[in-house]
């Protein structure tokens, strides 16, 4: 019993002692964990202050300090070099002259992190388990998602992981992990594989062997790249390599070459004004001369001639030019053919004559156009959304009001009127409208005689004014932008008769200044497509520029409305000389109609001595002058084939087919928007200038010789006038050629020979009066475009060889096209003034690709491979 009692007492004492030791150990562990937590919190708070200002990630020992003493992580500096091809401080924009590897580390940062790492940890028991590895959320953002090696020994914590409690990491792990994203970054760069060896033909070319991996830095054009291989930069032909990871697509942007400001800011609020050297984003193409863009928070349209586009913007412009316009224009040109089989083969549907097929085709065109339409105007946001909700959308697209926002609205009504063509146009008997002039052999007829116009009574539709309009006659109604108007009647010439819902005042106003708010769904009643037209729609369709290949170039607003039903065209082809009656709202004009496809004439119309156009019509005819008080109707004139004055009248056998070209806005090709057309018209003295016309066969009281002499006098006077204007504005005068590649330019020589020396082939592209001009400038003749900066844009759109041909003919090396370049030496340093310019240092070698007529060169620096603009007076050839 005594032994048992002693054993029991001993066991109780041992248990009590063990319990005390356990409590002491537990308290020590709790105190150690609390101390570690406080220490980790202090270190985490300290490290939160040590972060990169670009990516907001924590800095480590691989961070680099710039000469301006700003410190950034290595990954951000490498990404800046890859994207910009130069290194500038993100804080103060100071240019760094050395590479990222040559930059020193921040000694203060390294010592601070090293002190944290070497500081002894308190409260860690020898038997405690090693700290866990950092979770996926710790270094994944810094190291690009790559974890460190699992076997590395634990060091002091760098920062606290939210997912793993007391997980820590070490600076040695950071150094290990930082090598992974660098290699990963290099693998994510755009690169290509060499298909052949290239030794280089000129200084500055990059030499490489077959199978080499070349980092692509920049695409010079379709045939040449600028790349890097083993630290060497140079040019390489595109046909010698195969792009594995292509270059990223840049934003479609353009640099302003000139100042663009509108004179009347109230009526031209939709125009995007800018100054020289500003960079704007290109949204879409409006027509052949205008595009929609964005500058800051403002969206508007601007002339393409005023902006130098980059490659992405050029591709966007070409897609907008070819996809919507070429498709519909090609179908329309095919419908002009008299061969029914040709019409059936090109027709978009089997039942083109029905309104359902036309609306389906129109929806396909609209969807293709709206696929790239990322922005729209504020004034059209409500009405445009409501119009897209309709099942049959026959109203005018957004490109129609954009087309006329900053041009003469009377001229734009002729082009935009194609939206009001009827699906079922009844034919009229030409014998009931008086005499019809006899057409020349293979020439177009003209229907413009007087009569009564059938008017369609519309329902009480409410329209929204898109633009302000000031009345020019007593019966016209003033339009204010944003106000509602009720349309009572719609005239054939594009004018509406209605009343203001706000004031109740009634009158006539241009229909292209308003857009319908209350639309009738379906293809049925009360819309502009249900008008009964007395003129031939073929006269309005001839506003496109046809080419021998069968396609045509026209504005999107015109081309989108060119898909006409088969019955309409057949009826009007059977009656090419239908009469045009006039009503109370209709103003009289001359409307040329095409007798058949492939006519040999250029439809023109002339002013008689006491005859002037009073209202804009949907035809291609000269504008009325502002100073003409006459409201007399103009008689129908027969267009004749334009021939050289030395040869007189030609026989039908001598009249070879030529494409028809409109002359509706000849002044738009010679008058830049910043040259005041009002001043020009004031110097003319209000004398209306005749349209582009040749001696007519109609007896108007003038002999051919007298008319020829009068035309010469007007030509010489206008040449002197514009010569003085161009001298004053030479520093701001834009190039008058389209910046996009136009296949029509190859026809200028043949057209010049056929038209004679008196008329120069001024061709325009669908936007009537591309810039705000007066109608006195509309009939400018004999003026060559001012090719001042025609070579300022890179128009080399040659196609690179296909990959199939390259692989099938691997044994044959393609011959690369030579890149035009000349070696120049910089004699005076030049600091860049904008993003498009490059910095020149004395002694640098520059490869000049293009020389602009204003003295600026476009070239590539051999030192860093950057391409841009620079003044030619700072370099010399050697």
From Swiss-Prot:
Keyword Lipid metabolism: no
EC category name: transferase
A Pfam family matched in the record: SH3_9
Pathway: Protein modification; protein ubiquitination
SMART domains reported in the protein's UniProt record: RING, SH3
PROSITE patterns the record matches: SH3, ZF_RING_1, ZF_RING_2
Domain SH3: 187-246, 249-312, 458-519, 819-878
Catalytic activity annotation: S-ubiquitinyl-[E2 ubiquitin-conjugating enzyme]-L-cysteine + [acceptor protein]-L-lysine = [E2 ubiquitin-conjugating enzyme]-L-cysteine + N(6)-ubiquitinyl-[acceptor protein]-L-lysine
Region span, Interaction with RAC1: 364-433
Claim: Zinc is one of the keywords in the record: yes
EC number: 2.3.2.27
Domain of life assignment: Eukaryota
Keywords: Metal-binding, Phosphoprotein, Repeat, SH3 domain, Transferase, Ubl conjugation, Ubl conjugation pathway, Zinc, Zinc-finger
Modification sites for Phosphoserine: 395, 792
CDD domains: RING-HC_SH3RF3, SH3_SH3RF3_3, SH3_SH3RF_C
UniProt record similarity statement: Belongs to the SH3RF family.
Entry's free-text remark on domains: The RING finger domain is required for ubiquitin ligase activity and autoubiquitination.
Complex formation: Interacts (via SH3 domain 3) with PAK2. Interacts with RAC1 (GTP-bound form).
Designated name of the protein: E3 ubiquitin-protein ligase SH3RF3
Lineage summary: Eukaryota, Metazoa, Chordata, Craniata, Vertebrata
